[in-house]
């Protein structure tokens, strides 16, 4: 089997395709959450804290010199990233919780009793015939 055929067989498996779709949706969801935090959540929090723009919060370690940019610790952006992570982690937690509850409901359902085999059916008929003979 050639390398291309092996790759084609690998890529066409359901799990790989499902994983790729999940990664793409996850990346898009991450962008939505980042925008939600930066554009909707942080501005009101900044106003409450006295007009602070969180993306500008930083500590300058070394001022800019000539063409070299300043060396800063941008803790405001870090705070936004932590909030992004918290929202995404909570959304994943809620999704997994829903999936697990569905799995539990499926597990709790009693399994259907298997259909009797031909041997069992024959034995049941013999039993019924013997009971009928004893009753006479």
Swiss-Prot record:
UniProt keyword terms in alphabetical order: Cell inner membrane, Cell membrane, Ion channel, Ion transport, Membrane, Transmembrane, Transmembrane helix, Transport
Molecular-function annotations in GO: mechanosensitive monoatomic ion channel activity
Ranges annotated as spanning the membrane: 9-29, 32-52, 54-74, 79-99
Top-level taxonomic group: Bacteria
Main location: membrane
Subcellular location: Cell inner membrane
GO CC annotation: membrane; plasma membrane
Swiss-Prot/TrEMBL GO biological process terms: monoatomic ion transport
Stored Pfam families: MscL (PF01741)
Entry-linked InterPro entries: Mechanosensitive_channel_CS, MS_channel, MSC/AndL, MscL_channel
NCBIfam families: mscL, PRK00567.1-4
Entry-linked HAMAP family: MscL
Family: Belongs to the MscL family.
Complexes and interactors: Homopentamer.
Protein name: Large-conductance mechanosensitive channel
Taxonomic path: Bacteria, Pseudomonadati, Pseudomonadota, Gammaproteobacteria, Alteromonadales
């Amino acid at each position: 089997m050639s390398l291309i055929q092996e790759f084609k067989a690998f890529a066409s498996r359901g799990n790989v395709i499902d994983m790729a779709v999940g990664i793409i949706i996850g990346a898009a969801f991450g962008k939505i959450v980042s925008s939600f935090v930066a554009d909707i959540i942080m501005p009101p929090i900044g106003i409450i804290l006295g007009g602070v723009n969180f993306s500008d919060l930083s500590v300058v370690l070394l001022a800019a010199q000539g063409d070299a940019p300043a060396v800063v610790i941008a803790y405001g952006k870090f705070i936004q990233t932590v909030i992004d992570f918290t929202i995404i982690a909570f959304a994943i937690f809620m999704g997994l919780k829903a999936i697990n509850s569905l799995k539990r409901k499926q597990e709790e359902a009693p399994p259907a009793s298997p259909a009797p085999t031909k041997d069992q059916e024959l034995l049941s008929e013999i039993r019924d015939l013997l009971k009928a003979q004893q009753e006479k």
